[in-house]
């Protein structure tokens, strides 16, 4: 393996927009990474997630034309 070609691996502080910060290791030389969301404020991890059921093409079809019953489909 060649020496001197790999970037230096340094301790890095990750700062979130919510104020939470944690330390990890990275090759980023500044030593600081700023992110918008983290596991402390992301809705998926906090349990405040809104589930949007936009339906789909099948739901739209069933809404327009009604759901077919199985007996009619077998004929």
From Swiss-Prot:
Domain of life: Bacteria
Keyword Amino-acid biosynthesis carried by entry: no
Cofactor note: Binds 1 zinc ion per subunit.
One cellular component (GO) term of this entry: ribonucleoprotein complex
UniProt-recorded Gene Ontology molecular function terms: metal ion binding; rRNA binding; structural constituent of ribosome
Keywords from the UniProt entry: Metal-binding, Ribonucleoprotein, Ribosomal protein, RNA-binding, rRNA-binding, Zinc
Cofactor(s) demanded: Zn(2+)
Subunit structure: Part of the 50S ribosomal subunit.
NCBIfam families in alphabetical order: L31, PRK00019.1, PRK00528.1
HAMAP family in alphabetical order: Ribosomal_bL31_1 (MF_00501)
Role: Binds the 23S rRNA.
This protein's name: Large ribosomal subunit protein bL31
Lineage of origin: Bacteria, Bacillati, Actinomycetota, Actinomycetes, Mycobacteriales
């Amino acid at each position: 393996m060649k020496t001197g070609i790999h970037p230096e691996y340094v301790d890095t502080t990750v700062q979130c927009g919510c104020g939470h910060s944690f330390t990890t290791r990275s090759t980023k030389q500044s030593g600081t990474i700023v992110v918008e969301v983290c596991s402390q404020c992301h809705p998926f991890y906090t349990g405040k997630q809104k589930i949007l059921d936009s339906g789909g093409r099948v739901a739209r079809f069933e809404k327009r034309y009604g759901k077919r019953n199985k007996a009619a489909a077998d004929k």
